[in-house]
């Protein structure tokens, strides 16, 4: 509950009006991250491959699928690991860009993370596109065939976000 002194203090600051979500997204894309590309694409997902089912007292299974994105005659595939509870209940799902593939990581806290009753979808960000200025590998040449050709073209964060929105 706002008291009168707080309300007066805010009025004295003459703050601008609050922007809409769309206006804020536009500002963040224009000034910080760049615009995420709009491309016509097709997507396919392989059948699930079982990895291990013994997490959290055998209630969480680790599996993966291979996702393929195609734009025109070019395509790129990457592995998407899934940590899903076996009971089939709908749960919150966390999408996680990971620095390592789960099966390569010496420590990935699966037990601790799934303790909070969420499922996890994770991808190693370098499988989507490398973390550098090279726009010729991974999804980069499909989404940005001309590389970063303007100041408002997204970089790798935008490419990773584009992929995450499709997981």
Question: Where do the language-model regions lie?
Answer:
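N-terminal targeting or regulatory segments adjacent to alpha/beta-hydrolase or S9 domains
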Residues: 1-77
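Aromatic-enriched hydrophobic runs in primary sequence
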Residues: 33, 41, 77-78, 93, ...
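Short secondary-structure boundary segments
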Residues: 54-83, 140-159
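Short, flexible loop/turn elements at secondary-structure junctions
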Residues: 69-73, 84-86, 98-101, 127
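Proline/glycine-enriched tight loop/beta-turn segments at coil->beta junctions
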Residues: 74-78, 83-94, 115-116
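Cap/lid segment of the alpha/beta-hydrolase catalytic domain
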Residues: 90-167
């Amino acid at each position: 509950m706002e008291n009168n002194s707080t309300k007066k203090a805010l009025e004295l600051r003459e703050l601008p009006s609050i922007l809409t979500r769309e206006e804020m997204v536009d500002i963040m894309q224009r000034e910080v991250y760049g615009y995420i590309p709009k491309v016509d694409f097709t997507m396919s997902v392989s059948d699930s491959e079982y990895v291990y089912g013994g997490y959290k007292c055998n209630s969480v299974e680790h599996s993966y699928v291979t996702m393929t994105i195609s734009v025109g005659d070019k395509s790129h595939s990457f592995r998407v690991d899934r940590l899903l509870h076996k009971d089939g209940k709908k749960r919150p799902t966390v999408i996680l860009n990971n620095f390592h593939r789960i099966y390569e990581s010496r420590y990935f806290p699966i037990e601790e993370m799934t303790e909070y009753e969420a499922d996890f979808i994770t991808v190693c960000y370098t499988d989507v596109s490398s973390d550098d200025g090279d726009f010729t590998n991974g999804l980069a040449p499909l989404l940005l065939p001309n590389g970063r050709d303007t100041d408002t073209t997204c970089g790798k964060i935008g490419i990773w976000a584009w992929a995450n929105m499709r997981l």
